[in-house]
Regions:
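C-terminal accessory region of radical SAM enzymes
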Residues: 227-257, 287-339
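Radical SAM/AdoMet-radical enzyme domain recognition
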Residues: 56-57, 61-72, 79-211
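N-terminal [4Fe-4S]-dependent radical SAM core
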Residues: 1-18, 62
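Canonical Radical SAM [4Fe-4S] cluster-binding loop centered on the CxxxCxxC motif
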Residues: 11-46
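Short, small/polar residue-rich loop motifs at catalytic or cofactor-binding pockets
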Residues: 267-271
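Radical SAM enzyme core and accessory elements
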Residues: 1-6, 324-404
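Long, K/E/R/D-enriched contiguous segments that form extended
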Residues: 193-261
Length: 404
């Protein structure tokens, strides 16, 4: 009756382990936080194998009942041969060791979609389909997508929309419930409404969309953002899109006060996740690797040879809402759903601390909340007029927006 954003696989019980297989990408997206992309740092098989062996040998230290083996870049599918070898080895070793993750694992990818239809990628998908989660990033209309997601190369920059959209039908035929990720920066706010509706027209039923955490926002962006979301709300409700399609900007649970005595968890999973790069270094999250940071030094918590240094990891395990948020955020009447990224917090802080929450999206969150209230008020009024409000309430318990 109403399509809602679905929880991710094994949310809250899965360990996320990320292989940074390459720092190269075909694109040079203008809003990309990866400031140190390059063609040289590619993960070797020896480093990947050492990381796997360390993790599986220390099963007692990884007690989560499930695991998500995540592959990122750059563009991960540039290293499809290495990834295929890694995944084969993981399956063999988890089985051989009788590891508790063998019956509960996923291989996860976020890709630009450009070489999705290549023979090697398709062979890999066919072999591992039942354990795959693949998201293709398409930013909306061609105008919005090509505004930011451009091919790299001095004098060669051009939009990548046509190179991506051609693979959407194939992707959806293989993963019909897959969602896409959309990123909003200041320049493309005017295209939000038409872009979400365009993605719906491509039969992408779940659009996970967010504003960038960096301090890029201009005076008046929040008002324009709110207006775009209200216009989008009208289109979704008036044309019945809400029945089969979902946009993460509209969530019933956001925009409420938070009682930190009950809900004091960290929004971000940094420290509970684990990332490994081409040099074999471990990080609490990919955002703490050097290629993700504008002004701070990377935070390395170990390596594939010496293991994880618990003392370096400890500060991340103590993170929660109150230890890093200014009092204004804790007292905010619309605090729920206001997100943060631990890596951006660290990079934007005026000292080398992970306990200083960046608040660049404050006005944007409040604008989203106002539009979100408009959306749900209008939708509930429509449901009541049609006698369907009670049916909705009985089928859909209120869910919190998922932290990363």
């Amino acid at each position: 009756m109403i399509k809602l954003i679905e929880n991710s696989w094994q949310e809250g019980v899965a360990k996320n382990i990320t292989f940074i297989v390459t720092k190269d990408c075909q694109l040079a997206c203008k809003y990309c936080y990866l400031v140190g992309k390059n063609e040289k740092e590619r993960m070797s098989w020896e480093v990947a194998k050492s990381a796997i062996d360390y993790i599986l040998e220390h099963e007692i230290d990884f007690k989560e009942e499930s695991v998500i083996w995540d592959f990122i870049g750059g563009e991960p599918f540039l290293e499809i041969e290495l990834i295929d070898k890694i995944c084969d080895y993981l399956k063999i070793e988890m089985y051989r060791r009788g590891h508790h993750w063998f019956n509960s694992f996923r291989f996860s990818f976020s890709t630009n979609g450009i070489n999705y239809d290549s023979d090697k990628v398709q062979k890999f998908i066919k072999k591992n389909h039942n354990h795959l989660s693949i998201g293709i990033t398409i930013d909306g209309t061609q105008k919005k997508h090509d505004l930011n997601r451009i091919w790299k190369g001095n004098g060669k920059e051009r939009g990548s929309y046509e190179d991506v959209v051609r693979n959407i039908p194939l992707w959806l035929s293989q993963f019909p419930n897959a969602g896409t990720k959309v990123t909003i920066s200041s320049a493309d706010i005017p295209y939000i409404k038409e872009s979400v509706l365009h993605l719906y027209s491509l039969r992408i039923h779940e659009v996970n969309i967010n504003v960038v955490f960096e301090d890029v926002w201009k005076e008046g962006d929040d008002a324009l953002f709110e207006q775009q979301l209200i216009e989008l709300a009208d289109e979704i409700i008036d044309n019945g899109w809400f029945q089969d399609y979902a946009c993460s900007f509209f969530q019933e649970s956001i925009g409420k006060p938070i009682d930190t005595s009950i809900d004091n968890q960290n929004w971000c999973g940094a420290g509970k996740m684990l990332a490994v790069d081409a040099a074999g270094n471990f990080y609490p999250c990919t955002r703490f690797a050097a290629y993700s940071l504008r002004s701070k030094k990377p935070i390395i918590i170990g390596n594939v040879h010496d293991g994880i240094d618990e003392n370096k990891l400890r500060p991340f395990l103590a993170l929660d809402r109150t230890t890093q948020s200014p009092q204004e955020c804790i007292n905010c009447e619309v605090a729920s759903g206001c997100a943060w990224c631990q890596g951006e917090n660290y990079d934007a802080a005026n000292t080398s601390t992970v306990y200083q929450r960046a608040t660049a999206i404050c006005k944007m969150h409040k604008a989203r909340v106002r539009a979100n209230n408009y959306y749900w008020n209008k939708l509930f009024q429509k449901l009541e007029e049609e006698g369907k409000r009670e049916e909705f309430e009985s089928k859909h318990k209120q869910t919190n927006q998922e932290p990363c």
